[in-house]
Amino acid sequence: MSETRMAQNMDTTDEQYLRLIELLSNYDSTLEQLQKGFQDGYIQLSRSNYYNKDSLRGNYGEDYWDETYIGQLMATVEEKNSKVVVEIVKRKAQDKQEKKEEEDNKLTQRKKGTKPEKQKTQSHKLKQDYDPILMFGGVLSVPSSLRQSQTSFKGCIPLIAQLINYKNEILTLVETLSEQE
């Protein structure tokens, strides 16, 4: 009787070790993808800086940044089935600052007695679909290498969340395996 229980215990332990090896393999391959994405992004960024060296502002950097820009993506941390899961989601269209601006607009419209509804919907749409690369020169004047750099860096965002999830799952599996021994 104890031999069958021991065999079943070994089977579950073996499955957990196999799962750990699989998670480590996935973590390693995802880390290589992240490294490749960052490498490509920085190479393209250096190319765009090289082609932009003769401009008045110099390299693409903090001088070009629009400080009022609010990001489009947001990381959420949830607990599902006693596991901490990190997900990347799109930010909601309106933030607190925009709501305050709308309230101020309503007050000024009440004083004036006008209702420019078309202007509101157009400005709201622009804020929602704003591409941050436009702060580096507009639609037509952004170098293709800078666009490729943006694409490489955007591709890294889900990989980072995936790496965090793998790491959390590996840590919980290692804890359960150490408790069993």
UniProtKB/Swiss-Prot annotation:
Keyword annotations: Acetylation
Remaining remarks: Present with 752 molecules/cell in log phase SD medium.
Function in brief: Required for V-ATPase activity.
InterPro entries associated with the record: Vma22/CCDC115 (IPR040357)
Superkingdom of this protein's organism: Eukaryota
Start and end residues of each stretch annotated as Disordered: 93-125
GO molecular function terms attached to this record: unfolded protein binding
Species the sequence originates in: Saccharomyces cerevisiae (strain ATCC 204508 / S288c) (Baker's yeast)
Bias (Basic and acidic residues): 93-107, 114-125
Single biological process term from Gene Ontology: vacuolar proton-transporting V-type ATPase complex assembly
A single Gene Ontology CC term: Vma12-Vma22 assembly complex
Protein name according to UniProt: Vacuolar ATPase assembly protein VMA22
Gene transcribed to yield this protein: VMA22
